[in-house]
Amino acid sequence: METLNGPAGGGAPDTKPQPAGQHHRHHHLHPLAERRRLHRAPSPARPFLKDLHTRPATATPSAGRAPTPAAPRSPSLAGKAPPSPGPPAAPGRLSRRSGVVPGAKDKPPPGAGARSAGGAKAVPGTRRAARAGPAEPLSRVGRPTGAEPPPAVAKGRKTKRGPGTPPARAVVPPARASRVPAVTLSVTSVAGCRINHTDSSSDLSDCASEPLSDEQRLLPAASSDAESGTGSSDREPIRGAPTPSSGSRGPPPGSPEPPILLAAPPVASACLGGRSSPGGASTGSPGPGSQEDVGGRAPPERTILGTSKEPSLGEQPRLLVVAEEEELLREMEELRSENDYLKDELDELRAEMEEMRDSYLEEDGYQLQELRRELDRANKNCRILQYRLRKAEQKSLKVAETGQVDGELIRSLEQDLKVAKDVSVRLHHELETVEEKRAKAEDDNETLRQQMIEVEVSRQALQNEVERLRESSLKRRGSREMYKEKKLVNQDDSADLKCQLQFVKEEASLMRKKMAKLGREKDELEQELQKYKSLYGDVDSPLPTGEAGGPPSTREAELKLRLKLVEEEASILGRKIVELEVENRGLKAEMEDIRVQHEREGTGRDHVPSTPTSPFGDSMESSTELRRHLQFVEEEAELLRRSISEIEDHNRQLTHELSKFKFEPHQESGWLGDGVSKGPAASVPLQEELKSARLQIDELSGKVLKLQCENRLLLSNAQRGDLAAHLGLRAPSPRDSDAESDAGKKESDGEEGRLPQPKREGPVGGESDSEDMFEKTSGFGSGKPSEASEPCPAELLRVREDTECLVTIKLEAQRLERTVERLISDTDGFIHDSGLRGNGLASPGVQGGGGEGNSPSEPHLLETINVRMKAFRKELQAFLEQMSRIVDGLSPLSHLTESSSFLSTVTSVSRDSPIGTLGKELGPDLQSKLREQLEWQLNQDRGDEREGLRLRATRELHRRADGDSGSHHGLGGQSCFNLEMEEDHLYALRWKELEMHSLALQNTLHKRTWSDEKNLLQQELRSLKQNIFLFYVKLRWLLKHWRQGKQMEEGGEDLEESEHPENVPGLAELGVQGVHQTDGIDQEDADQGCSLPMGEHAPHSLVQISEHGSRLQSSDGGPLNKQVVENQQLFRALKALLEDFRSELREDEHARLRLQQQYASDKAAWDVEWAVLKCRLEQLEEKTEKSLGELDSSAEGKGALKKEREVHQKLLADSHSLVMDLRWQIHHREKNWNREKVELLERLDSERQEWGRQKEELLWRVEQLQKEKSPRRSGSFLCSRREDDTRPYPHQGSLHSSRPVSMWPCEDADSIPFEDRPLSKLKESDRCSASENLYLDALSLDDDPGDPPPLRNCLAEEEESRKGNLQRAVSVSCMSEFQRLMDVSPFLPEKGLPSAGSKEDVTPPLSPDDLKYIEEFHSNDWDYASPRAEADRPPDPWADRTEMGRVGHEATTEPCPDPSWYLTTSVTMTTDTMTSPEHCQKQPLRTHVLTEQSGVHVLHSPPAIRRVDSIASGGEGRSRADPEGPFPMSRARGNLADAKGGHPEPVLNRWPCTPPRHPRDCVEGSLRPLDRPICPSLGFASPLNSLDMSKNMSDDMKEVAFSVRNAICAGPAEPHVRDMACQTNGSRTAGTQTIQTISVGLQTEALRASGVTSSPHKCLTPKAGGGTTPVSSPSRSLRSRQVAPAIEKVQAKFERTCCSPKYGSPKLQRKPLSKADQPNSRTSPGIPQKGFSESAWARSTTTRESPVHTTINDGLSSLFNIIDHSPIGVRAGSRSRSAEPRQELGPGQETGTSSRGRSPSPLGVGSETFREEGGESTPVRQDLSAPPGYTLTENVARILNKKLLEHALKEERKQASHGSSGLTSDSHTGEPVPAEPGSMEELPCSALAPSLEPCFSRPERPANRRLPSRWAPPSPTASQSQSPGHPMSMEEHGEEDPPEEKPHL
């Protein structure tokens, strides 16, 4: 080994120098190439090299293979470490370099080692050098075997070896040293030079690729070849002998080789070692191989010599003769040189490839850089835009806060817009240019493609030319040689030939060059094309990405090429088809001949007589008949197949549709169509329907499969028949046919039908019948030779088999028909169901309108499927009829074949019979006719499936009859059917068909007309129901107004009872009125309220119960029952209403009669009195005349007396008329009151009993509903029920009697899930009947849902006061609805109301805004309105402030809110502004501090405390102020009115015995005290109190409600208990008639419409003159202001903070009014400021421009209008209250109020910074923490506001305390503003009012904000009261202040 090492070492040095160049050369190539290759080792390239090396090595390995195992590990390891047994270091490198070499190394035995080294070297070289200059390594590797490589390889190896050699030597173990050293040397040198690079890379890359090398090693032969180089394999074969020996010697050769290496010059040995292992050494014996390798490695010559010598010394002497050796060596050298050349070429190619790749990579890199730059630019732009966006957001926030529009911002935005436009234009242009470039590039690409194609063509042409030239030259050469031999003399010719040859050679070289060039160009173009593909997508891709598909021209060209190909293919196929057809014809002819033969034989025999009717007499005819029949059968089968495929397609479609429906159940729910049934219960039937549909579809698919199976069976049977016909003698034996039919049956019956599919798959006459055919043929050939030979039996057999075949076909067709029938029936049923569902045809109770949207699509699909199925069925039937005709017509045979064979015989006969042809001819006609008829019929009515079934049955009967008749004819002995007979038969058939069709059509038409009529009937019924409902509503409205008129006269408030159409049980029951049920609470409240007064209360609960029940039923499929129930309820309600009308008319008549009598008696009395007086006068005159005598003075005295008398007479007449009037009124009222009282009491009793029963029933139903429906709905129903039950009780008692808190549904509102609350009501599907809801809502506006209608009836006064008030808000979703509402609205200006003071109460017609407010409040109030069992409820509900429940609790504490307080919150309405505990807490803090200051003790207590307080106060208020206070129904209104009324008692007195001067005031002022007023200070149970303000009301609403409540309660100034939930300022003005106005900042627009001030803006605008202008209308507000400055103050106060814009709506944060603005507003305090009641907040929320905007929410709920119909006094009071309470309070108090203002709510605490100083104080944004109802934006706004508020609050408080106090005191210094006599007469204007305004300083919308001054001259008080904070001032400045109140968000 040492020697080896030494020599190797020596060799290495020698070699090194030489290889160095090579090595370097390779190396240069190598670093990139090899590294890439190494990394790409796994790629084929490297394996290829390895394989080259490996092959030689492998070949070598005979010797080297033993080592190979070790080598393998070295490959991977060696690559990295010298693990290879060989030289540790070298092996590592070697193995690394040559993934395969390691094997060689390990293999190295003698030659293997060398070769392996060479291979290794070569491999590494190849990888490195070969990668770079693969040729060299390869040549080396290859040369190892050949001596050639030595020069190059030797150099390379030496070079490699040089560096690596020493380590190799040192490391290599002695045994392997020879090989390994060589390897090591070569490898090492390689490693040293190149491998170092490759090693590092190859270490990594090889690791991955080494497996390959290992694999190669594992394949030593291959690997040795590869290692030795490509040449090695060649060489190895040469050295085959040596190799084996070396192989055997392999391991030993290690020693031999070392000697060889030693003997050889060091170079040789080195070369040998290095070379031999890679090259021949390993391949061959160590000697030759090694020598060769060494030679290869060593300088070629030296290596060769040395090697040859050495090998001869070492091994050759033994193996080969020296000459042979030399020859071998020469060959090896040649091979090596060739390998080197090839390697060089490969290197060049590789280099070119690398260059190209590099160029592409560079281009990609440039593109990537460009893209990165673009990305950076885009990022930069994004950053800039983000920055701008942030800036803009900040600015917008700023604008929202300040309310000032940033002109600069607008300008900058405009500039940005211009820039953006420019940029977009520029980008557009750039895009166009880029597009142009792209198009150009595509064109270029196209041209290049064309060029490529041309080049390819030319290249092909050149190749062909070259080939031709080559061939010609060869020929010439041959001929020339012959010529020379023959004619040597002809030198000229030879010279010519030489010249030609030369030319040809030159041409060939030129062509080669051109070819090479073309090849390069082609490669370049291909690469470019690849690049384009990567960029633009594949040209072939069906959908080019972008324009990636390449230019259209290119695609055209490609498509043309493809088209050509396809056309060629088509032509080929066409030719094949033609050939096949020809062949087929030939076969048919042959078969025909055979059949004719058989038939002749058959006719020859006498079996024919046995079948007298058989047309076999003419065998040709019969065969043609059969053939025709078979053809017909095949056509039928084809039709069947097509139909089935269509059915399958449709089935798939249907499945798809169903799956769609499956995932869109809501659409399917449309099928039910009934909005009411749209709940969970409704979805249940839908789901069931879906399930059944899915099942049906599954069945359909199964049946389709069966159909397919049967169809295939039919086809196979037809084939069999065909075969039978063709083969003649043996049709499928009965056994076969039976088996098949059995199989078919099995398939069709069981769904294992798929098993026979293989048979079924074939087309008619396809291979599927091969088995049958085989059976038949085999049976025919072998089974029945005797029959074949015996003509008679054969003929009979044939006939029988034919008939059997026909019978089986018929059976299959019948089975198929049955399946189709089943399918059709199923589909029909499905269509019918879905149609019923979708079109409402089947479910009378269901309205189909909703469902039609979805159902049509699916039923339509099903119908199309059905139509096609029926058409298919028709075809089948026609086919079956033909079969039957054939079979029956041939039935004469039936007696011969009693069994199925009879039919088959008949069939076979029929085939031959003329009938067959006739049938065939007529069949299609019949078929088409039938099909048309069927389709027509189907089109007529797709749903008449049952009728179709009947038809089918009849048809079957007819067919049977026909068959019978046919068989009879046959039996008649007719040997053949006469054409006449057949025609008669067909005629009869057709006649029957026509009859059936006419029947079917009649049926269909009948069904159709019936369904149409039914639909029409249903529609008419619906319209009738709707009309009845409208009639009912209008009647109710009329009745209400009638009663209102009476009440106005009597001062009663009964009218309201009838004002809630909802209360009418019928309404809820009406299908129309589904909505309210969801709103169970509202509806129930309203319904009960109404129904009680009308005696319909019980019906209402019934209605709801029945409604629920009906819902259950409907879900259970009892729509009819539901409709019946609804209709019954409606008629019941109508009946009750008519009864009421009758009673009213009767009373009217009685009153009229009484009046007549009274008039007559009075007139008589007057006449008598007049006569008496006249007498006295005359007497007096006489006396005076006598006394005065002739005095002239007597004349004067007479004149004076006359005048005096006239005056007296006038006075007397006036007094008399007044007395009469009053007496009449008193009479009327007393009568009404007594009657109503009795009626109400009776009704209450009866209804209570009814309720007891209904309650049980309802509970049970609710339980059912809960089970079936969502808990939410059931919960609401339960609550409603509960409430319904309780509600009546309170009313039942005296007015004063407090009703159970839980009495009102609202009371339970808390218990009701939040969702079930009014919001849920609005949300519920019931909402669907919006129009009806509107009616109901509108009707209910005046009715207090909470108020028991009976009470209302009783309280005429209250009702009177209420008349004016729109108590309930209707959710108006659109103007049309609103208009409709207004038309029907009982709340429209009460034209019928007396113009008495009560008229003032009349609310002007509601504006949409008013409606909205009403709606908002209504929702809230409705829930809250009912005196919820809050008092009863534990305070815990308060824990849920966020929950409506909280509100509900508050509400419950209060008796039912007055209708005026129906704050309906639209769904959007914020639920609880105060609900969030934070608000409550915050408020309490502020309020507590300031409460005392305000002078109003505002206790911010937790809802529980509040509840208690309210209860207590309610109790006090009731007892104190309103004996009737207990009646919550009008409480809200009444209380407000009373409060405003100026009489604390009237205020509290809901039913003041004496109508308050302002009935409105009475109504509003007499807020019935809460059963237990929450706030004692509120001594009345203001509806607000009763309202669970926290419930659905937004904070603003709560505030408004609270303020209203306070105002209503405004008793002596009692500390207001501020309802935290309300977040209202509880400041109450304690004027003589001070209304406690609690400024309620409307957090949500909902409060806007609060009854009193509830509509913060216009809605609350008092009807100052009792005018009919909508409350919200500015005029009205101004008027009201004029009427009662005090009220204005109150309103202002109310508006003041309550409406703090902040809370009112985040948007509303008002900006401090400019001082100028504030003073203005202050100046016109006398004019009720819309703002007051509206609350600046609401105004701010409302559209600034709309006059009614106040009512319009900023977007929270455009529908949310609270219409305050409460008397203007009340409204004004509430409004002014918002302003006034502050007035009252004075600066300190005001501060208190403001502080009290719900901190979160707009109380104006901070937000309302009392801007009495002229609004200097910045509005304090109150806490924005929004109640749960708040929208996100509101929350954000609230948060922002909170912070701002807190900050502003501090300042505002300071200001409020200082400036605010001053301002307030100035403006409202408590100067009582004279109010209308009935209104609070002089509410001291407290500073509070001003501060209030600032809170809402956000300017009102200009329309709303008409300056009060505009409307009324501001009174000094008013101006005072109107502090900048006053809503009114705000209103005045609304235009001016907008900035202040701009929405924060």
Curated annotation (Swiss-Prot):
- Keywords from the UniProt entry: Cell cycle, Cell division, Cell membrane, Coiled coil, Cytoplasm, Cytoskeleton, Membrane, Mitosis, Phosphoprotein
- Location of region: Necessary for interaction with MARK2 and apicobasal microtubule bundle formation in polarized epithelial cells: 1257-1368
Q: State the coiled-coil residue ranges.
A: 320-396, 424-712, 1120-1196, 1229-1270
Superkingdom in the source lineage: Eukaryota
Name the cystine pairs.
none
| Phosphotyrosine PTM positions | Y1413
Q: Which GO terms describe its molecular function?
A: microtubule binding; protein homodimerization activity
Q: Where is this region: Necessary for self-assembly, microtubule bundling activity and apicobasal microtubule organization?
A: 1-500
Q: Which stretches does UniProt call biased (Basic residues)?
A: 22-40
Q: Which residues carry this modification: Phosphoserine?
A: 74, 84, 209, 213, 255, 290, 541, 610, 677, 768, 891, 913, 1270, 1371, 1385, 1407, 1501, 1510, 1577, 1586, 1655, 1673, 1677, 1778, 1795, 1799, 1801
Residues with the modification Phosphothreonine, per the entry, are T613, T1403, T1661, T1669
Composition skew (Low complexity), residue ranges: 55-81, 91-103, 167-183, 240-249, 273-290, 1672-1681
Any one GO CC term of this protein is: cytoplasm
According to the UniProt entry, which residue ranges have a biased composition of type Polar residues? 610-622, 1717-1726, 1738-1752, 1857-1867
Q: What is a biological process (GO) this protein takes part in?
A: regulation of autophagy
Keyword check for Cell cycle: yes
What residue spans carry the Basic and acidic residues bias annotation? Answer: 599-608, 733-762
Give the span(s) annotated as Necessary for colocalization and binding with microtubules. Answer: 1-241, 1672-1767
> Membrane: present as a keyword of the record?
yes
Function text: Microtubule-associated factor involved in the late phase of epithelial polarization and microtubule dynamics regulation. Plays a role in the development and maintenance of non-centrosomal microtubule bundles at the lateral membrane in polarized epithelial cells. Required for faithful chromosome segregation during mitosis.
Question: What is the similarity comment for this entry?
Answer: Belongs to the SOGA family.
Q: Name the chain's protein.
A: Microtubule cross-linking factor 1
Organism encoding this protein: Mus musculus
Which gene name does the record give? Mtcl1
